[in-house]
Amino acid sequence: MHSPGFQYRLYYPRYISGYEKVKMYTTNQTNTMETGPHTKGIVIFGATGDLCKKKLIPALHKLWEKDLLPENFVITGSARRDPGVTVWKESLGEYPDEFMNHLDYISTDLDSVESLRHLPDYLEDNTYFLSVPPERYENAIVNLKEAGKLEDPERSRVVIEKPFGYDYKSAHHLQSVVERYLREKQVYRIDHYLGKDTVNNILATRFSNILLEPLWNRTYIEEVQIFATETIGCDGRAQYYETAGAVRDMLQNHILQVLALVAMEAPCKMSAREIRREKTKVLAATRLGEDMIFGQYQGYRDEEGVDPNSRTPTSVAGTLFVDNWRWEGVPFRVLTGKKMPYGCVEVVIKLKAPPLKLYDGEINDRIVIRLQPNPHLDIRMDIKSPGLDDNLELATLTHDYPQDRAVDGYEKLLYDAINCDQSHFVHADEVMESWRIVDDLLCTGEKCKIRTVPYIYIGGGWGPQHKVDRITDWDYPA
């Protein structure tokens, strides 16, 4: 035991500030007083992979440029392979030396408790980012806990990439592991759509404007259409896509999260707890319709890593219903897929026609929220054309969302995780309700409740269009 007033040195590695830094601690009879600031850090597992190089490090660099990272913030890359810190840094690309001085690398194995004990212990607040295959999540959480890295729920957290589970059963199992070793406040489940400014703007548009809220219900809305389409195919990801398909890749997460934001009730305050509670309530009231259509683009089965007899859907179209007071009877149409004519994420709110038709050529009013690309908000309505007759023409009020101030999804999500804000992360209950909704679509046997055998479609169309067009009169994006 040191005597009162004894001073000892704690060495910080040079990459915190570019040189070896010493912090002095002074003891007294009752406590240990630290004279320097707390140090935060993020440990990225899977740091030799593409996600780290292409998304995470660029996002952290942008936060650093904006002076939004703590002064002594440390970014530690980690993976089983050990290229060495110099080679790893060089593999990331060109960044200023001042930023690179915050980076370090240590080789660890998520399957080994002893290996994880070698992670830095000089950091007092840690965010652990699991940029690893989903099948490694369970061992990672268990072993990080056993290694003593997650003991303080106020100063340690785990960021988990999608997918959280493969179906309802596997998600339930993974959640049981999470509950056993972590508190929910320590778990940050990423859906990168929730980091997009334009997606977050859905709530701002709805709840900060009295103009729209009185119309936002079954009395005035005929249907809602949600598009998440791509012009590309699997683009080298066929092996992954073969195990995921359009349901797991898009519908279970991104599309249902957008639906929840469009359909949820106003939270009593803009906190993580209240926002996620309202989203969960909407998802709990959501069910599939009976007109779900699967498609698979022609040539998919010829791609490397794909079963020649694959039934994996590359497109899904159909209807969901939200069985609550606000939305009873209003169909939510969804369309997602690859190799389609136009790539975008868009929400179309189609309003009902007036009770009495006084003019010829009336078109239902629409509110269109384009999330990407070229994000904007449109309000489309009929007005009288200039002239002597009573012809109508479409008028569009458009607000283009300014992109010069927009932030990348991972930039927003990393900033929130580091600062312990779960507002834009997915709660366990949301995950389980989402899997419940789509679970019937994952059936591959002969006794499936819904036909899950995909119709083959030629790239450049809206999936198997002869089937898709029977669902509704789509407002296809352009």
What is each PLM-predicted segment?
Residues 1-30:
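N-terminal amphipathic/basic-hydrophobic helices that include classical n-h-c signal peptides
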Residues 25-159, 164-478:
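Secretory/organelle targeting and membrane-embedding segments
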